[in-house]
């Protein structure tokens, strides 16, 4: 559970770390949309190269980011299996009443690849952006909506805290599982339904710890006289540079290349 990378931050001074947080948020959003627009394997060659390039520039190894997929293996396998057996088409192999089709195999592999790129791509945002910078970036992007009554700072703070709590909750789950296994609990044996039922006793202590951490955070913010974004100043002002412009251009080329690939190959 502790291996999940979404929500974690690795300090650094790479060119990716130094990018304006608004740039990284917008590029990540565009990257996610692009993954759902692409509908063939050739188009995914460009996002794959993009992820590898960002990994090299950020100094965060691709192997480390792939570790974040381990807690989600069940979801990835389930996605593949559902597509494999549910999509009708040219039959490759029969397993009783179930048919494995060419179209199902193609779509299952395609969806797994999309899911992996989605997880790894979004992980890069939090891995290279500090919580403060992420909050400032989201708040700045939401600032125009203040005119219609949207609390930009509060919403940005909520989103950032939610992201940062993901690895914390995963760590809490891991600790509770180990404590219960030491007392004889078995989470590994049995069928899928039995394993799911064995996880129910984890929920009560997990929610109690989550509420306790949330209460501690609220008390810490209250003791520091936190009053939202009212009259709040920043030590570092957000300012885009030529590196941000280059990042936007690279993302634009990525989008064009991915979409045009269907007409080339």
From Swiss-Prot:
Q: Does Transit peptide appear among the keywords?
A: no
Q: What is its main location?
A: membrane
Which GO-annotated molecular functions does the record name? transmembrane transporter activity
Q: Where in the cell is it found?
A: Cell membrane
Q: Where is the signal peptide?
A: none
Identify the GO cellular component terms for this protein.
plasma membrane
| PANTHER family from the UniProt entry | SLL0384 PROTEIN (PTHR34857:SF2)
Give the family, as the similarity comment puts it.
Answer: Belongs to the energy-coupling factor EcfT family.
Q: What is this protein called?
A: Energy-coupling factor transporter transmembrane protein EcfT
- What's the gene? ecfT
């Amino acid at each position: 559970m502790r291996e999940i990378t979404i929500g974690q931050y690795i300090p650094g001074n790479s060119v990716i770390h130094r990018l304006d947080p608004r740039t990284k948020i917008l590029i990540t959003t565009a990257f996610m949309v692009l993954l759902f627009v692409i509908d063939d394997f050739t188009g995914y060659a460009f996002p794959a190269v993009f992820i590898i390039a960002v990994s090299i520039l950020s100094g965060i190894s691709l192997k480390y980011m792939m570790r974040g997929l381990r807690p989600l293996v069940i979801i990835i396998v389930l996605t593949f299996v559902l597509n494999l057996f549910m999509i009708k088409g040219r039959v490759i192999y029969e397993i009783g009443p179930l048919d494995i089709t060419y179209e199902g195999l193609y779509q299952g592999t395609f969806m797994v690849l999309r899911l992996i790129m989605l997880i790894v791509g979004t992980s890069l945002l939090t891995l290279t952006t500090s919580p403060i910078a992420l909050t400032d970036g989201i708040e700045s992007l939401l600032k125009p909506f203040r005119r219609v009554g949207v609390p930009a700072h509060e919403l940005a703070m909520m989103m950032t805290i939610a992201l940062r709590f993901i690895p914390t909750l995963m760590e809490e789950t891991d600790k509770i599982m180990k404590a219960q296994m030491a007392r004889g609990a078995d989470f590994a044996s049995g069928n899928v339904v039995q394993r799911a039922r064995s996880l129910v006793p984890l929920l009560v202590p997990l929610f109690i710890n989550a509420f306790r951490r949330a209460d501690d955070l609220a008390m810490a913010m209250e003791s520091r006289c936190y009053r939202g974004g009212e009259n709040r100043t920043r030590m570092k002002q957000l300012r885009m540079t030529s590196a941000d412009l280059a990042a936007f251009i690279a993302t634009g080329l990525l989008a064009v290349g991915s979409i045009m690939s269907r007409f080339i190959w």
